[in-house]
């Protein structure tokens, strides 16, 4: 595995299996996301140079594509019968990009929030976007 592939695999924010509707709409971050953020915090010293190097755009593009693919598959499975106000590919790539940008900022700022707090915050952002996209109301 190349160093680029190793870096890209580091950015899997959860299990590579589909997330259920309940998990996608939960207020709690999935354990896999928390574990990934912890791992990224521990790996910050070698991640930063790679994310700022000459291949960073290629690396980030591949990370975004992989995350978007995972997110879109989960959305399609969890909301198979529902109509989205936002095309699912647009929704998935937007959530993937937001998560990558959040992690970049977090690493650049020397982790001003714990991995747990960051994961919970992103889960809430993701939940709000998904709920809006599918027109879901609070019960």
Kindly give the residue locations of the regions a language model identified.
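HTH DNA-binding helix-turn interface
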Residues: 1-16
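Hydrophobic alpha-helical connector segments
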Residues: 17-46, 56
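Short linear capping/connector segments at secondary-structure termini
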Residues: 18-20, 50-57, 80-85
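Solvent-exposed, amphipathic alpha-helical segments
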Residues: 18-20, 46, 97-109
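Amphipathic alpha-helical packing segments from all-alpha helical-bundle domains
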Residues: 31-35, 39, 55-80, 89-101, ...
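Short, hydrophobic secondary-structure boundary micro-motifs
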Residues: 48-50, 59, 115-116
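C-terminal peripheral helix-coil segments that are non-catalytic and often amphipathic
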Residues: 73-77, 88-89, 105-139
């Amino acid at each position: 595995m190349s160093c680029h592939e190793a870096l890209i695999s580091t950015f899997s924010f959860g299990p590579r299996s589909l997330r259920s509707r309940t998990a996608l709409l939960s207020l709690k971050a999935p354990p896999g996301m928390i574990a990934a953020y912890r791992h990224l915090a521990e790996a910050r010293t070698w991640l930063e140079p790679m994310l700022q190097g000459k291949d960073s755009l290629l690396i980030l593009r591949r990370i975004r594509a992989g995350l978007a693919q995972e997110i879109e598959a989960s959305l399609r499975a969890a909301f198979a019968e529902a109509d989205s106000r936002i095309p699912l590919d647009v929704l998935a790539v937007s959530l993937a990009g937001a998560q990558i940008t959040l992690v970049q900022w977090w690493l650049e700022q020397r982790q001003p929030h714990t991995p747990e707090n960051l994961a919970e915050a992103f889960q809430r952002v993701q939940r709000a976007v998904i709920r809006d996209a599918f027109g879901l109301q609070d019960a």
